[in-house]
A protein has these predicted regions:
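Short glycine/serine- and acidic-residue-enriched loop/turn motifs that recur at repeat junctions
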Residues: 1, 25-39, 63-78, 102-116, ...
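Aromatic/pi-system hotspot detector in well-structured domains
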Residues: 2, 15, 40, 52-57, ...
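Repeated scaffold domains used in trafficking and secretory/extracellular systems
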Residues: 5-6, 43-50, 81-84, 120-122, ...
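N-terminal non-cleavable signal-anchor helices
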Residues: 6-7, 25, 38, 44, ...
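Acidic/polar residues in short coil/turn loops that connect beta-strands
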Residues: 21, 59, 98, 135-136
Length: 174
């Protein structure tokens, strides 16, 4: 029985729940098993995609597991001062307190594209694409063009928030 759940994220293969005491619960098929999250503690934020599950702790460190193997997402163990996460199918982005974006996973194009992004205040990801909002209200994009739907992006100014969702395709809205 799940009790004291403060956040629930349903997914294609799993459901993640963040409890008031900072623990995380998981249920679902998980390619044969749910995520192994029983050891996750002091969690303040959870995120998932069809490829992975992740969480930010109160100290700004990250837990992250691949869906198909329950193995850690390599590279995230050294992340510090993380304030937000954005998972894609085969990558995970973290936003640091000083506005940098860190990345781990298997999508070399995205990992390379975001490494120099600075002054970022929000990140969002879907499948194989990423958007980031800068402190100046500009939006940066990268990823598979099939998943990027942006018309007139060069005219976007003073954007205040990014919203991402998936419903058969991928969309970012500013």
């Amino acid at each position: 029985h799940w009790r004291n759940v403060v956040e629930l994220i349903p997914g294609r293969h799993h459901t993640l729940a963040l409890c008031a005491d900072g623990t995380v619960l998981a249920a679902g098929q998980g390619y044969g098993q749910p995520y192994a999250v029983s050891g996750w503690r002091n969690v303040t934020q959870i995120a998932q995609s069809s490829g992975l599950a992740a969480a930010v702790t109160a100290s700004g460190t990250v837990y992250a597991l691949w869906a198909d193997s329950n193995e850690p997402v390599l590279g995230t163990e050294s992340w510090q001062d993380i304030t937000a996460l954005a998972p894609g199918d085969d990558f995970l982005l973290g936003l640091t307190a000083d506005g940098r974006v860190v990345a781990a996973g298997h999508n070399e194009g995205i990992l390379s594209a975001v490494k120099d992004w600075r002054n970022i205040i929000q990140i969002a990801a879907v499948s194989e694409a990423v958007a980031a909002l800068t402190g100046e209200g500009r939006v940066l994009f990268c990823g598979n063009p099939r998943f990027l739907r942006y018309e007139g992006m060069e005219c976007w100014q003073n954007i205040r928030q990014l919203v991402s969702y998936q419903n058969g395709g991928s969309v970012f809205v500013g």
